[in-house]
């Protein structure tokens, strides 16, 4: 009986941390004027929409908060990004994030949030990749 109660408390704490992390990421998206849709309540029914926490429509990318969410098991972001040809960002509760794209897993150092010099909008990308803005399409040169 006591073990079950402890498990319930732990589950509430885990999901509480998940919702707090989602809230913090949503606040960041709002602050930098990044368009976002909260997937669990969006009514969208694609494979990524079922596991992702946010869809970033201007970039056609998905964002997954790296904490447990009720009803969601483990998500293999590397495999999913390759299969569906989408950029997936895995964001932690500490503000760190990693980018997965075309089946590649980029380290936190290689995963960046850029601001386009032309349109001023922010977008996620991998550092070895192209610096073409994922919002307006403007190319800002080779920064490698």
Feature annotation, model-predicted:
Residues 31, 48-63, 78-83:
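Active-site beta-strand-loop-beta-strand hairpin of nuclease catalytic cores
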Residues 40-49, 69-72:
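Acidic-and-aromatic substrate-binding clefts and catalytic sites of carbohydrate-active enzymes
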Residues 116-121, 134-138:
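Short, cysteine/histidine-rich loop/knuckle motifs that typically chelate Zn2+
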Residues 1-40:
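Acidic-basic catalytic patches of nuclease active cores, encompassing PD-(D/E)XK
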Residues 5-16, 55-76:
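Short beta-strand-loop-alpha-helix junction that forms the active-site gateway
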Residues 128-143:
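Cysteine-rich micro-motifs
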Residues 67-118:
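Catalytic cores of nucleic-acid endonucleases
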